[in-house]
Design a protein with these regions (language model features):
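Catalytic cores of alpha/beta
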Residues: 36-44, 103-115, 161-172
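Conserved anion-binding
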Residues: 49-131
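Hydrophobic faces of well-ordered beta-strands that scaffold small-molecule active sites
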Residues: 21-27, 56-58, 84-88, 122-124, ...
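Hydrophobic/aromatic-rich structural module bridging two neighboring secondary-structure elements via a short loop
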Residues: 23-48, 55
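Short, compositionally biased "basic patch" segments
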Residues: 9-19, 112-117
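Active-site-adjacent beta->alpha loops and helix N-cap segments on the catalytic face
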Residues: 3-16, 32-43, 60-85, 95-96, ...
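C-terminal alpha-helical cap/extension of soluble enzyme domains
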Residues: 145-173
C-alpha cells in the first residue's frame, strides 16, 4: 500500500535518474514477495523493472532463505538488470540474540555466496551490533569480522546515529 500515486512515484524515479541517482527498494516488499513463492517473486521483480528500480535489497536475517533460493533470486534480479544488495547481520527488528549465538561465519559465507551469484553490495545491519544493545557495548568486533572479508567498495553499513556513522567513515572511508 502506498499513499503516492503511480504517476508521482514514476516522476520521482525519473528525476532521480536524470540526476544520476540510483533508486533502491528496501527488503520488506521483497520479503513479502518471497513469502508468496517463486511466481510472486518473479512478478515483483518484473514490477521493479517496469518502474525503473535499480537496486533491490534481500535480507538474509529478516527471513530464513537457503543458499540455493538466495542464488536463484539474485540471478532472477540480475536477468532483469536489477542489482542486489544483500543485508547481513545478527538480529532483525527487535529480536534478541545472545552474543555467543551469532553464527558470524555462516553470515559471512552467505554474503560471499551472494556476491559470487552476482549481488552488488553487502549491507551490514545495525540491529544487535550498534542498535538496541540495551546498554551493552557495541559489537565493533563482529562488524570488523564481517567487513574484513569484503572489499570496502562492496560494503554498506546501516548507522542508526551520527556517532556510529562517524565511526564507519573513520574506519572504512
Amino acid at each position: 500500500v502506498t499513499f503516492s500515486s503511480p504517476e508521482s512515484i514514476s516522476e520521482a524515479i525519473k528525476i532521480c535518474h536524470s540526476n544520476s541517482i540510483k533508486v533502491a527498494v528496501g527488503n520488506p516488499p521483497m520479503d513479502v514477495a518471497l513469502s508468496g513463492g517463486w511466481g510472486v517473486t518473479c512478478g515483483f521483480l518484473d514490477e521493479l523493472l517496469a518502474r525503473g528500480i535499480d537496486y533491490v535489497e534481500i535480507s538474509c536475517i529478516a527471513r530464513a532463505i537457503d543458499d540455493g533460493d538466495l542464488e536463484k533470486v539474485i540471478l532472477a534480479a540480475k536477468q532483469r538488470n536489477i542489482d542486489v544488495i544483500i543485508e547481513v547481520g545478527v538480529e532483525f527488528a527487535h529480536s534478541q540474540s545472545e552474543d555467543g549465538n551469532l553464527f558470524i561465519e555462516r553470515r559471512i559465507q552467505q554474503a560471499k555466496l551472494a556476491l559470487q551469484a552476482g549481488a552488488k553490495m553487502i549491507l551490514v545491519e545495525s540491529e544487535g551490533l550498534t542498535e538496541n544493545r540495551n546498554g551493552q557495548a557495541y559489537r565493533w568486533d563482529v562488524i570488523d569480522r564481517i567487513a574484513s572479508n569484503f572489499p570496502t567498495e562492496q560494503l554498506m553499513f546501516e548507522a542508526d546515529d551520527q556517532d556510529v556513522l562517524s565511526r564507519y567513515i573513520d574506519v572504512f572511508g
